[in-house]
Regions:
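Core beta-strand elements of the Rossmann-like FAD/NAD(P) dinucleotide-binding domain
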Residues: 2-4, 150-159
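N-terminal Rossmann-like FAD-binding beta1-loop-alpha1 element of flavoenzymes
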Residues: 4-31
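Conserved Rossmann-like nucleotide-cofactor binding loop
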Residues: 14, 37, 167
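Glycine-rich FAD pyrophosphate-binding loop
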Residues: 23-48
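Conserved dinucleotide-binding and phosphotransfer motif residues
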Residues: 25, 124-125
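Active-site-adjacent segment of FAD-dependent monooxygenases/related oxidoreductases
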Residues: 54-116
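A conserved short coil-to-beta-strand element within the FAD-binding core of flavoproteins
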Residues: 131-144
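Conserved FAD-binding catalytic core of PHBH/FMO-like flavoproteins
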Residues: 144-146, 163-200
Length: 200
């Protein structure tokens, strides 16, 4: 049975960012992820799942040592933002020039962020990546948690972090309540190519 200080259930962007942030802390960290990410092909078409990374997130990703890797792949900076709600009069807009910045942030494919964090975690001697790995059972002891994987292997951890998404298996097993509501909204996501520059 393997013992670690911190077990992170979910090796997506959030789980991997936590793991990379714990690097060098002296804690033994294990990340449990259902799938190993596929390598990113340089000529692959852009993916539709993206995140707007603001300046604070850029600083975090820089501190984690992955921002330059992300920029070297695919990232597009944005200079303005406008947010509104069709059901109210709420509206806000701002731009980089009025705030004295060169840009507000970057739009980055989630897979690019994920792959950069995965590579960083792989390089760390403090982090063990367990993938593919899927939880089957969890039991909370007085000073540690016992995790049983579907392949029958076991792991103990002093701290368990649930980063396994909106429909978290771990959160459900821990009986942590969740408040949510359906907005009755739908979204259309697309990649658009323009003949003329759009001055993002």
């Amino acid at each position: 049975m393997q013992s670690v200080d911190v077990a992170i259930v979910g090796g997506g962007m959030v789980g991997l960012a936590v793991a990379c942030g714990l690097q060098g802390s002296g804690l033994r960290v294990a990340v449990l992820e259902q799938r190993v990410p596929e390598p990113l092909a340089a000529n692959a078409p852009p993916q539709l799942r993206v995140s707007a990374i603001n300046a604070a997130s850029e600083k975090l990703l820089t501190r984690l040592g992955v921002w330059q890797d992300i920029l070297s792949r695919r990232a597009s900076c944005y200079h303005g933002m406008e947010v509104w709600d069709k059901d109210s009069f709420g509206h806000i807009s701002f731009d980089d020039q009025s705030m004295g910045y060169s840009h507000l942030g970057h739009i980055v494919e989630n897979s690019v962020i994920h792959y950069a964090l995965w590579n960083k975690a792989q390089q760390s001697s403090d982090i063990t990546l367990l993938a593919p790995a899927e939880l089957q059972q969890v039991a909370w002891g007085e000073n540690e948690t016992f995790l049983t994987l579907k392949d029958g292997s076991m792991l103990t951890a002093r701290l368990v972090i649930g980063a396994d998404g909106a429909n978290s298996w771990l959160r459900n097993k821990a009986d942590i309540p969740l408040t949510f509501w359906d907005y009755q909204h739908h979204a259309l996501v697309a990649t658009i190519s323009t003949e003329e520059p759009h001055d993002a």
